[in-house]
Structures are given as structure tokens and as C-alpha cells.
Amino acid sequence: MKLSRRSFMKANAVAAAAAAAGLSVPGVARAVVGQQEAIKWDKAPCRFCGTGCGVLVGTQQGRVVACQGDPDAPVNRGLNCIKGYFLPKIMYGKDRLTQPMLRMKDGSYHKDGEFTPVSWEQAFDVMEEKFKTSLKEKGPEAIGMFGSGQWTIWEGYAAAKLFKAGFRSNNIDPNARHCMASAVVGFMRTFGMDEPMGCYDDIEQADAFVLWGSNMAEMHPILWSRITNRRLSDPNVKVAVLSTFQHRSFELADNGIVFTPQSDLVILNYIANYIIQNNAVNQDFFTKHVNLRKGATDIGYGLRPTHPLEKAAKNPGSDASEPMSFDEYKAFVAEYTLDKTAEMTGVPKDQLEQLAQLYADPNKRVISYWTMGFNQHTRGVWANNLVYNLHLLTGKISQPGCGPFSLTGQPSACGTAREVGTFSHRLPADMVVTNEKHRDICEKHWQIPAGTIPAKVGLHAVAQDRALKDGKLNVYWVMCNNNMQAGPNINEDRMPGWRDPRNFIIVSDPYPTVSALSADLILPTAMWVEKEGAYGNAERRTQFWRQQIKAPGEAKSDLWQLVQFSRRFKTEEVWPEALLSQKPELRGKTLYDVLFATPAVSKFPLSELKEDQLNDESRELGFYLQKGLFEEYAWFGRGHGHDLAPFDDYHNARGLRWPVVEGKETQWRYSEGNDPYVKAGEGYKFYGKPDGKAVIFALPFEPAAESPDNEYDLWLSTGRVLEHWHTGSMTRRVPELHRAFPEAVVFIHPLDAKARDLRRGDKVKVSSRRGEVISIVETRGRNRPPQGLVYMPFFDAAQLVNNLTLDATDPLSKETDFKKCAVKLAKV
């Protein structure tokens, strides 16, 4: 391959930048630079985590052949992590699904049949029959959908509209329930609005970074490279990392803290106490902008009502709170002394004091980052509320370099799962199904009869598993996730429901995942740039991309599947007469007609697409579907602090952070001069709350749902590794990533291994009260658990670690605690 001088310099610049950030550049990234003239390039956000890195996608002869970091992308500035560099290869696994597959026996569907190729017509015929039978016999509560924070914005919007307005079922929930639900409820309780008030620009202006249950070095490596650059360029910048085990982020930490599982609640209250005792409360900010409330306690663990822990709880699932005075709050946190905190957490006193001093120092700009360590927690909402307390006490919020920041793990957990409202209790723009006014807004905008959207909250993720097992949920459509592997307590609740002959399970996926192979019908799905899409990242940045290639075989996008399936239902088959009588003109029409082919959605003509621009869905329907859906959806947030820009602006930008008002994005919300919704003279206004004030909550320590005992004597924490994303359904099909980390291992302290006669490399049986897996002992390497705890990643389909985990959830957010259950080890 011949390189021009310009191409050679560009290739070396990429390599040098990556090396400076501690990132590697694989050969595929270097090789593409010299082929620029032969390759067509276009922009897209990365397919993986919630960071939202921009990439340039190279296509040639109908295939993605190359990928490189987009130097014009403000998030990553031309860099990619190791997964981002291998994006092209996720598309072309040898077992890519290209046609629908139905379990069949003797020529027809059978629950115990073999997967057999069928046409889309046949697949939809079976789905139609199953949906209509369940709707007729049991009603809307008998059908459900489990979606994704990887859906594009219009896919999630179409799914929510089809289920909540079309089928009149709120039994739709995203896999973001497993990762971001606690953050959502935490934001709503404290601020009355979802999502962070800051942005990634804070990194270059902060004086201190505190990571709470977040291994950014591996899970958000591009952001970590920016933090690393900030830390190494200024000796006064400090980094504190808190976790239940040591990991790669500890390598940069000035204060690396390993605490006893669940005791982060104690540390948070101790810091609040320290701030008050050392007169570090920002009195002016606190007096003007904060209210105090005492939350209900002893709220249970989100288990079945028959579980002993739920029976014993005084206030199961209670979100109640009552006003309290500052003196009462001061007395409440005063119980969390330094001595008590050190004893309960196992953290040395000097480390606790150093941490508290970062927050208390009025001259230090502090950012708190967290991910699953906080959120996947039976008191995850409380943990979110308690870290907000620290920033509200000190006024370190909504200003450059200051603020609490919940990081997301999926590319559109914010943009789709949260903003669109694909949760079982939500509607677009932070509205909820239980609020009559909110339902009325949606019904009028969608031009459907009043009362169409049910007022009852639907089944959340774990409740869906239980309802399937109990035979109450009978038709279940899973899209863009691998929950059979990723969800908790596989043996006891999920697998029995999926294989119950009363139930029919559909999985839409590009690959034969554990979930797909456990289903009754598999629908082959288009991936990433095989469709036009939009994601919303962790800093409220909405990013668009165009379809750049066609999907293989008969694979279709989730959007196509939803819209085309809606044609199978007439309004009379899904809506009662009481609704139809309000709008008799809708009789005889299909759900496609009343939801997706409406004047509002279909008004943008195909002429808005360039002649050679791929867009399979729109060209098949005859109008610009994605634009119609987006503009209809964006209406909900405009003028209400969730403003999205006009559709076309996003194709011309590297993303925009909402609220976007008069063409200008917002970096810092709630503060005067930064947020267009805060008027001159107001200083700060937390306008999600009626009085414009945020809330500090008094919430205590409460123990985990399950702790080690004499038989199951070790804590188990689960999570990810750098090389693989979630269940590995994409990354394990990339040979280089698979070789880098080919199978899951059990990270264990050397002394715990020695006490059990285990050595590095030994096979070991890991058992809990719910199941067991066989794994490999690892006493060295990147993760270093303390004695009494083991860590396992969940990417390996041959080691289903979620056979072990407990389906306990935060009672407020319904998010599963994947970080704490009890296990034992035995040599194999």
C-alpha cells in the first residue's frame, strides 16, 4: 500500500495521540488512512458505551471496511478505545442471522421444535396470532416488550407508541432498567428532572475527581484519558477512587479506597457530617436553592411479596418523605462519625478525611462520577440522592468543573430509554403514565382517544420475568438486548418463564445469542450503520448518523419490524368500543395508519433525502419516517427544558447537548448565564421542581439483601472488562478482542485462593443459593479484590454468572443489584 506524505503524517498523528492517552491503535485503524480515496467516509457515534465517541466509518462495496476516531468529534477528539477501533468487525461474525427462524415440528410452530428458516410473512403470521389470542383472552397485560438503551431514538419512540398507545400495554421496559433506573429516580427525586446538569467539558476545569463505583479506566476509557491528561498536567489536581475491589482506575488515584460492600451509604453520610462540622456549607446557595426532606426507611428489597425480607420490611417500596429542618438533618448525619464510618466500612480514617476534605474545600472544583457501583444497588436511588447532598451542601453544582455526573453504559440509555420514555412508568420528556395530565398531553398530540394510554404502571424488567414464570405474561418481544445472559437469577425466574409452553417469546437480534437460542422466534436485525439512527449520550448530546450500507440477507431494523408489524392490527382488535366511539373515523384503520402514517409523521417527503442516500424504511414507505417520528417526539420537550434541535441540524453537527434553544446548546443546566431557562437574577433554578429548589434527603445505611455467611462465605461482584461489552455478543465475534480476553475468570485474593487450595489457572465451581458456574481462578491481573470478595465479568456465554446473582432490586427504581450476593468456591 502506497501512502502519501499527508496520509503518513495523519496516520502517525493518530498513533501518537493514542499512545499519549494510553490507548492502542490496532493495525486496522492504521491501514485505512492510506486508502481514503477508495473508501467512502461518513460520521457516526460509536455503537458501544454511553460516552458517545464520534467515529468516521469507511465503507466500500457495500461493507464497512474501516473505522477511525473522528478528529472533529468534541467527545473523543479523534481517539477511540480498543472496542471502537474494531467496530467494523462487529458486523461480520460468521454466524450473523440473515432470515427469521421459528421453532417448528412437523411443518408448524412447536415450543420444542427446531429452529427453521421462515419468511417475514410467516414470522409475522405467527406473531399476529399469538398477540391477538393473548389480547382477546387476557387483555393488554398479557403482552410485553423488553427493549434497549441501544435502540435508536426513533426505534424506542416507535416501540413505546405501539405498545402504550396501540396495544394499550405499559408492559414495555428497556434493559436500561438494569443499569440507569436508579440514576433516573435519583435525579427525579432531587431535581425533578432527569439527566446530568454538567458535561464532559467539566473535566478540563475540575480540581478533583471522585469515582464512586466506577472503573472509568476500562468502562469509559476515552473520558478516563481526558481525566488522566488533566491529572498529569497539574500536580494540584486530585483523583479519589472508591470501590469494593481495586481495579485499573486505582492506578491513577491519589486516594484509592476499598470499602465493605453496601457501606458507601455510610461514607456519603459521613462526608455530609464532615462538611457541616467544618462549617463548609455554602450558606447562601443552601438557603436560596435547597429544601430538606427525610425519606422513608426499611423499604424492602424488591423481591417477591412472599419473600421473608419483603414480609419483614415496614415500608416496602415506599418513596415517601417529609420535610425536616437543618438542625434535624445535622443531627441525623452527626451519627456518622469518623470512628463509626471507619469501623463500618473498613476504610482507614486518614483516607476518609482526605476524601471529605475534597468536598469541603471551597476552593476545589469537584466532579463526582459513578456508574454501576451506585446504580446496581438495593439502595441505589439513595446513593444517588446522597451524593447530590454533598454538591448541594457545598454549592458545587451546575458550574464549570463542578457537579455530580452519572455516567451511562449504553449508547442511548439517555437518549432513548430515558428521554423517549421506554420505561414501563414513563412517557416522553420526563412525563409518567400515572399522571392524567401527562397522558392527556400524549393522547392529544398523537390524536388518539382520551383514555387510550393505561394509567397503571406496567411490568418492569424483573417483574416481567416473574410474570412470565407465573403465566401472566404470555407474549414477549425482546429487542436489542441479551437479557437471558445479562439479567439476574436466570435459573429461578427467567428461564422457566421463557420455556413455559403457555408463553411465546420473540427475540430480534443480529446474532444467535443466549436469549435468541432460548426464544421461539428469532428475527434477524440490522445493525448500527445498516440503518439511519440517533443516540443520546451521557452529557445530553444527541447524535445522528445516516444509513451507510444495507443489512445482510433479510435482516431488518427494529424500526422496520415495529412499523410493519403494526399493519397487522385494526383499531377494533385492540381498542374497546368506549375509545372508538370518541373517534369513529379511526374505525377500520390499522395501528400503522393511526400511529405511523399520520399527517404529522408522514409529512416529510422522500425528496428530503439525497438521491443516492440509503434509507430502507423510508423508501419502502414513501416518506421520511425517521424525520417524522423525531419531530413528533421532539415536540414534547420543546419549551419545557428538554428542547431538541430541528432534525436537520443534527446531520450537520457532531451532536448537540439539550436543551437547544435558538440554535444554541446548553453545557451547564440550572445556572444563570449557562441555562436559557434560568432568568437573570435567579442565580440557580432547579426548574424541575415547582419551587425551583433541589432536595437534600436524609437517608440512612441499610444492609444488603444477601451477605456472606458460614456456608456462602464470599461476596460476589459482577461487571465488565475493557475488551468486551456487556454479554460479548458483538465483541466476542471480533477475533482480536476475543483473543485478548477469551473467557471469564474469577478474580480472587491470593490468600482466599490459598485457603481453598486453589491456584491461578485452576478450574473452580462458584455456587450461590440459586445456581453454579465453572470458571478459572485468577489471583493476579487488573482486578484485585480484598479478602472476602470475588469478581466475575458477565461477557462469557459459557459461564453464565447470572445463574448466581439474586434478583433483589432497589424498591424505588426496580434496578437489580448485580454487585452483592453470597457465593462459595470449590475446586473442580
UniProtKB/Swiss-Prot annotation:
GO terms for biological process: cellular respiration; Mo-molybdopterin cofactor biosynthetic process; nitrate assimilation. It catalyses: 2 Fe(II)-[cytochrome] + nitrate + 2 H(+) = 2 Fe(III)-[cytochrome] + nitrite + H2O. Keywords: 4Fe-4S, Electron transport, Iron, Iron-sulfur, Metal-binding, Molybdenum, Nitrate assimilation, Oxidoreductase, Periplasm, Signal, Transport. Predicted to be exported by the Tat system. The position of the signal peptide cleavage has not been experimentally proven. Residues 39-95 form the 4Fe-4S Mo/W bis-MGD-type domain. SUPFAM superfamilies: ADC-like (SSF50692), Formate dehydrogenase/DMSO reductase, domains 1-3 (SSF53706). It is found in: Periplasm. Component of the periplasmic nitrate reductase NapAB complex composed of NapA and NapB. Belongs to the prokaryotic molybdopterin-containing oxidoreductase family. NasA/NapA/NarB subfamily. This is Periplasmic nitrate reductase.
